[in-house]
């Protein structure tokens, strides 16, 4: 029995299977297995997935940082050298300052030449520098992710990524703006998922996106000073669209024939907000909203409500929309919401993120807001088809006394005027007074719909970790610890690795 208990079962597994198992942990941790026995000496280096992250090494005192950087670079060089020309599935590299730039570019070129299919680059090793051109010329890449902590320049010469399906770029500066973007998209002939966040543009005023294969598009721009002159989207097979940017002067081409879900965070510039007036469009974004009017799921962020008010006329009809989420803000009015809700004839679920809004002259108009009017019942509410109304962050105080009472008044008004409501769910993460709860209980019999139920949910209720079915009330998660390259154990790994592979 003792012999069976002590038997090393894992070491008897096929070497290819062991390498596969080692690919599920960071390469630095997998390297520790080289100390187990002669058989394990090089196995970690032949894992099809390599994950190098210098942040888990930086536990040493600052005085030793140069030595740590040197050992990290030596470690990566040794692992890649041991692998030779073997096939690599995924290569992840996350580096900070102190790692030689030429070494990094050499590693990237090495894995691309070996046919890596998934490349993930992060950190600030290319800050204010151009990404090596070899990244954008690969016959094997299927997924490419570049996320840097500071701005990385994309200055493209050639783009040839015939198999790339997923492209994720963050903190990117497009040099030669529109030309660079067009070259990037046209060089990815089967691209399906494109994410571009924290974007900057060099001398760039007009933007154009055209792709017949794209299914998901996420765009977050960071240029707060310049509005684009013209934007076009020709993406007929797009299913998901997430768009945060300054509103453009015009949207010439908008082709979203297959769109199902959209999340819009458009905003006006400060001077546009200051000079906006009812009846005069600041810029014309109507074509964009017409283009997304066939969606089934729509999320509008607070600034987008202002864009609807001052940059869109008329608000289009959203015939297929069944789920609408609206983020609110104390500095943004609700002038556009009545017309929007009237133009959603099949809306089933309405979600408010907060119940904040700025009082405007339109609040007293018949259909100028959603707050309770002293004149008439809001027709956008009395004719609403909505069955489920969710209010997130209910009771959250924005900045003034009495905000909780105003929110309660709105809730009462919704319940009293929306005839098709079947469920109202109020989510709160602050303390709700007993007075509010009792008023809601009192209101339930007075709701417009006899089918409606009201549910109050606390989002910050305490949760406990489970260990073998036992609830641990006082459990404190220990901080994770990582061995750094000053550890004796890792000091043994590099010299023990040697230069010759165990197998090829």
Curated annotation (Swiss-Prot):
InterPro entries, sorted: F-box-like_dom_sf, F-box_AtFBL13-like, F-box_dom, FBD, FBL60-like, LRR_dom_sf, LRR_FXL15/At3g58940/PEG3-like
Domain F-box: 7-60
Pfam families in UniProt: F-box, LRR_At5g56370
Keywords: Leucine-rich repeat, Repeat
The LRR repeat ranges on this chain: 69-95, 145-171, 173-198, 286-312, 329-354, 369-396, 403-428
Keyword Nucleotidyltransferase carried by entry: no
Domain FBD: 382-427
Tagged with keyword Lyase: no
SUPFAM superfamilies recorded: F-box domain, L domain-like
Record-given protein name: Putative F-box/FBD/LRR-repeat protein At3g59240
Organism: Arabidopsis thaliana
Lineage: Eukaryota, Viridiplantae, Streptophyta, Embryophyta, Tracheophyta
């Amino acid at each position: 029995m003792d012999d069976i208990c002590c038997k090393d079962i894992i070491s008897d597994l096929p070497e290819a299977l062991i390498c596969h198992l080692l690919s599920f942990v960071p390469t630095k941790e997998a390297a520790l297995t080289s100390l187990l026995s002669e058989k394990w000496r090089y196995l970690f280096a032949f894992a099809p997935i390599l994950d190098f992250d210098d942040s888990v090494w930086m536990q040493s005192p600052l005085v030793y940082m140069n030595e740590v950087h040197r050992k990290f670079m030596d470690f990566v060089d040794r692992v890649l050298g041991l692998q030779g020309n073997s096939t690599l599935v995924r290569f992840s590299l996350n580096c900070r300052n102190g790692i030689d730039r030429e070494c990094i570019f050499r590693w990237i070129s090495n894995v691309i030449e070996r046919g890596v299919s998934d490349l993930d680059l992060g950190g600030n090793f290319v800050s204010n520098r151009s990404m090596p051109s070899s990244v954008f010329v690969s016959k094997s890449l299927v997924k490419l992710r570049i996320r840097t902590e500071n701005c990385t320049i994309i200055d493209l010469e050639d783009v040839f990524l015939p198999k790339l399906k997923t492209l994720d770029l963050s903190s990117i500066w497009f040099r030669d703006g529109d030309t660079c973007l067009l070259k990037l998209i046209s060089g990815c002939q089967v691209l399906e998922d494109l994410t571009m966040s924290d974007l900057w543009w060099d001398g760039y005023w007009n933007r154009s996106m055209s792709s017949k294969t794209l299914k998901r598009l996420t765009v977050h721009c960071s240029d707060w000073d310049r509005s684009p002159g013209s934007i076009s989207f020709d993406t007929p097979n797009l299913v998901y669209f997430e768009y945060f940017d300054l509103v453009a002067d015009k949207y010439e081409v908008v082709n979203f024939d297959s769109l199902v879900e959209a999340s819009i965070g458009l905003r006006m510039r400060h001077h546009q907000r200051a000079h906006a007036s009812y009846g005069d469009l600041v810029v014309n974004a109507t074509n964009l909203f017409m283009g997304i009017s066939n969606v089934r799921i729509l999320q509008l962020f607070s600034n987008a409500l202002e864009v609807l008010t001052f940059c869109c006329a008329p608000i289009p009809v959203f015939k297929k929309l069944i789920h609408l989420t609206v983020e609110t803000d104390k500095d943004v009015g609700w002038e556009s919401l009545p017309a929007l809700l009237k133009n959603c004839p099949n809306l089933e679920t309405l979600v408010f993120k907060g119940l904040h809004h700025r009082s405007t002259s339109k609040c007293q108009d018949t259909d100028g807001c959603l707050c309770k009017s002293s004149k008439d019942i809001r027709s956008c509410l009395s004719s609403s088809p909505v069955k489920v109304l969710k209010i997130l962050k209910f009771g959250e105080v924005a900045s003034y006394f009495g905000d909780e009472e105003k929110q309660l008044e709105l809730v009462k008004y919704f319940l009293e005027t929306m005839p098709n409501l079947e469920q109202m769910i109020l989510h709160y993460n602050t303390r709700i007074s007993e007075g509010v709860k009792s008023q809601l209980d009192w209101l339930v019999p007075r709701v417009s719909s006899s089918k409606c139920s009201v549910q109050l949910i606390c989002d910050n209720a305490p949760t406990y970790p489970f260990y073998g079915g036992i609830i641990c009330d006082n459990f404190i998660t220990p901080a994770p610890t990582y061995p750094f390259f000053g550890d004796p154990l890792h000091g043994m790994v590099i010299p023990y690795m040697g230069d010759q592979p165990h197998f090829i």
